[in-house]
């Protein structure tokens, strides 16, 4: 009888221990699931753009938001990405609410007066241009291609219609600037390009900037594929300083995405900037002086499509664009 009682007691202790072990295991398992769930939630909040950016999109209706030392940028190619904020690079002072579109052209307004200049950029590809009709359409300035370097062989070529376009545009009362499509990989090549441009426009009336247009080639392999951010900045500076030393206003042309990821903006902040960003209003964070807002414009006197631009400065006089009557 006593032996049976001892066995029963042992069974009860074993059962109690087993229950305690099961309870402990259950608590540990629940805790693990809870912690893992919290970690998953944090990961989702960090990696999922919808989770991270929803408050920004709903509350601010902007493509940019300051987050410490970074900007959240929405890009049509890259999606939503963080890019650095540079405290020493001037930010844009353009009030996008003052940009209006009339008859296919965009204007920067102050009440009922226009505070911008309307422009186009063209090359030999536009063929023969009736500059009188272009002026009659309300075009104030034209950025004319001076030339280009081939992205494969690296050959520098001057635009066939450069001189004729400058002189004919000037005769019609249109101010002119020029741009060079660069594929330079060294500062020596950038200086070579600048010298070619300066020689080509010698004796011409160029009052708008002389522009360095260095672009990435996406559809083919190019000699510039491995150009670093540092080397590109060196090339920009070499070209612009050469242009400045000749008495012209240097400028850098770039699209928003490449500007934010490929240009060393702190090193290039002192040069005027021509922004390419197509749409109803620009979203680029930093300062720009000319905005190319369309590659699909139509202008009387020019066959086919043409790029359209706003200049926030009147480079013809070296001052902010003067006011004029409200556009029709």
Mark where each language-model region is:
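Sec-dependent signal peptide cleavage junction
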Residues: 26-46
């Amino acid at each position: 009888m006593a032996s049976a009682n001892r066995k029963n007691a042992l069974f009860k202790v074993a059962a109690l221990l087993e229950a305690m072990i099961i309870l402990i295991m259950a608590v540990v398992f629940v805790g693990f699931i809870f912690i893992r769930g919290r970690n998953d939630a944090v990961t989702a909040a960090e990696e999922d753009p919808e989770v991270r950016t929803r408050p920004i999109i709903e509350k601010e209706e902007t493509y940019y938001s300051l987050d410490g030392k970074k900007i959240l940028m929405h890009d049509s190619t890259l999606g939503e990405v963080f890019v650095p904020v540079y405290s020493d690079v001037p930010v844009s002072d353009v009030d996008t609410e003052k940009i209006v579109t009339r008859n296919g052209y965009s204007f920067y307004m102050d009440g009922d007066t226009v505070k911008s200049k309307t422009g186009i950029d063209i090359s030999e590809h536009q063929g023969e241009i009736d500059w009188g009709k272009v002026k009659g359409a309300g075009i104030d300035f034209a950025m004319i291609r001076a030339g280009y370097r081939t992205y494969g062989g690296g050959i520098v070529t001057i635009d066939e219609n450069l001189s004729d376009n400058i002189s004919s545009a000037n005769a019609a009362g249109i101010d002119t600037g020029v741009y060079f499509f660069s594929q330079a990989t060294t500062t020596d090549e950038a200086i070579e390009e600048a010298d070619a441009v300066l020689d080509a426009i010698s004796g011409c009336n160029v009052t708008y900037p002389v522009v360095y247009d260095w672009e990435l080639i996406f559809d083919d392999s190019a000699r510039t594929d491995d150009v670093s951010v540092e080397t590109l900045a060196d090339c920009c500076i070499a070209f612009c300083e050469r242009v400045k030393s000749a008495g012209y206003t240097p400028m850098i042309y770039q699209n928003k995405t490449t500007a934010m990821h490929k240009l060393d903006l702190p090193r290039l902040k002192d040069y005027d900037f021509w922004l390419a960003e197509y749409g109803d209003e620009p979203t680029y964070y930093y300062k720009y002086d000319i905005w190319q807002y369309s590659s699909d414009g139509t202008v009387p006197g020019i066959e086919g499509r043409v790029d359209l631009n706003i200049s926030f400065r009147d480079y013809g006089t070296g001052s902010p664009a003067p006011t004029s009557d409200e556009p029709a």
